[in-house]
């Protein structure tokens, strides 16, 4: 029997978001910034329910509206494009997602420069999609560049540095460079332990990756 009790808070939240969106549409109009924000909030809720097609339609509407109102490179437009790219990738539309993420990277670089964390995170996201397409060489190049910049600007123990290091280890593992991948992931575990402790969620996740690597017959 399906347990629906745990789903009820999420269903209630989505209903509230729908009501808020309708109120905003009626009071302010379809293209008002508050309406577009309410639309994106509802898309997030639908995404959490697994209703990816409905979420994607709302995200597409928000992207179009923000492009008209704010322009292609406004931070709010880029945020909406980023959410749409995630939905596209989750539905298997990797090439479309990659094109949008490349657009985000260009926009972030133009607004913030190459070394800003938002730019570096955008490149990190792009690398994930590139890797999902099987282009591990390009993904590795992107992640190595992000890691070098993040370590230089913010230090190797910065959370973004450690996340990038772990992502790079995953790509190296997929490429078949198991020894280097394991060594890099081990560094992540050690720095997570020193920085956040053994019981931190990020530390436990890093340890779980190491354990997965050790169980792999190919290691």
Which positions does each model-derived feature cover?
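Intrinsic-disorder-linked linear interaction elements in eukaryotic regulatory proteins
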Residues: 1-219
């Amino acid at each position: 029997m399906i347990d629906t009790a745990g789903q009820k808070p999420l269903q209630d939240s989505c209903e509230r978001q729908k009501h808020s969106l309708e109120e905003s549409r009626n009071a302010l109009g379809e293209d008002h910034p508050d309406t577009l924000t309410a639309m994106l909030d509802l898309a997030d809720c639908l995404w959490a329910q697994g209703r990816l097609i409905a979420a994607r339609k709302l995200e597409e509407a928000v992207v179009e509206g923000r492009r008209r109102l704010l322009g292609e490179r406004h931070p709010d437009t880029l945020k909406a494009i980023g959410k749409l790219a995630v939905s596209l990738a989750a539905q298997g539309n990797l090439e479309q997602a990659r094109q949008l993420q490349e657009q985000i990277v260009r926009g972030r670089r133009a607004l913030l420069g190459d070394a800003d964390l938002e730019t570096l995170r955008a490149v990190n996201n792009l690398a994930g999609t590139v890797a999902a397409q099987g282009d591990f060489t390009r993904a590795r190049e992107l992640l190595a560049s992000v890691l070098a910049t993040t370590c230089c600007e913010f230090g190797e123990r910065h959370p973004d540095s450690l996340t990038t290091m772990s992502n790079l280890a995953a790509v190296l593992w997929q490429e078949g460079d198991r020894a280097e991948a394991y060594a890099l992931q081990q560094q992540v575990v050690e720095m997570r332990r020193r920085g956040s402790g053994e019981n931190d969620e990020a530390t436990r996740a890093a340890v779980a990756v190491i354990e997965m690597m050790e169980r792999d017959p190919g290691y």
